[in-house]
Amino acid sequence: MNIAVSPTAEGSSGRAQVQWSLRWESELQLADHAELAEFFRKSYGPTGAFNAQPFERSRSWAGARPELRVIGYDARGVAAHIGLLRRFIKVGEVDLPVAELGLYAVRPDLEGHGIGHAMRVMYPALQELGVPFGFGAVRSALEKHLTRLVERQGLATLMRGIRVRSTLPDVYPNLSPTRIEDVIVVVFPVGRSISEWPAGTVIDRNGPEL
């Protein structure tokens, strides 16, 4: 789950003016991709120059390309973003259809509120898509942040001690085509209860992360 969170936050002024838009990927125009790419470069750049590289020019995705996006706009342009991609993952030995959530980023003045608002816009779409679960994976450094924003509000369950295997978005002669990461798995129950999530300590995306 590509996620960018700024280390600082401003006051809450301007949060009420954010307008949330649910956009299918085929609805986006070149200008939309260019605006989103610039937003991601500014959001992911502070976390490391390498993290901003996928968004060169007008590319508005990093690994797998989302099919649906929730985008928050205000007078300053793009304020927040989260993407969705339906896919099958393997949890242990069980093949499971999920909606992977990723490409999350928020401007500093919305920090602490962006993901909660975005998920409230996204959740009805998850229900309409008929998926049993929303799924994401974040590095352990963001555990407290996600606990505060989604787990305590009852939006999701955080699972620890899980390893996720993904393919790289491109093939490099000097790198393995797959990588395995120890991450925090975030599960959003949609069509099923969290008790129906399969047991397993290894999840295979069989593709690049969103």
UniProtKB/Swiss-Prot annotation:
Keywords linked to the UniProt accession: Acyltransferase, Cytoplasm, Nodulation, Transferase
Gene3D superfamilies on file: 3.40.630.30
PROSITE patterns, sorted: NODA
EC main group: transferase
InterPro entries: Acyl_CoA_acyltransferase, NodA, Nodulation_prot_NodA_CS
GO cellular component: cytosol
Entry's EC annotation: 2.3.1.-
Localization, UniProt: Cytoplasm
NCBIfam families listed in its UniProt record: nodulat_NodA, PRK00756.1
Function description: N-acyltransferase required for nodulation. Acts in the production of a small, heat-stable compound (Nod) that stimulates mitosis in various plant protoplasts.
Similarity comment: family membership: Belongs to the NodA family.
Protein name stated in the entry: Nodulation protein A
Lineage: Bacteria, Pseudomonadati, Pseudomonadota, Alphaproteobacteria, Hyphomicrobiales
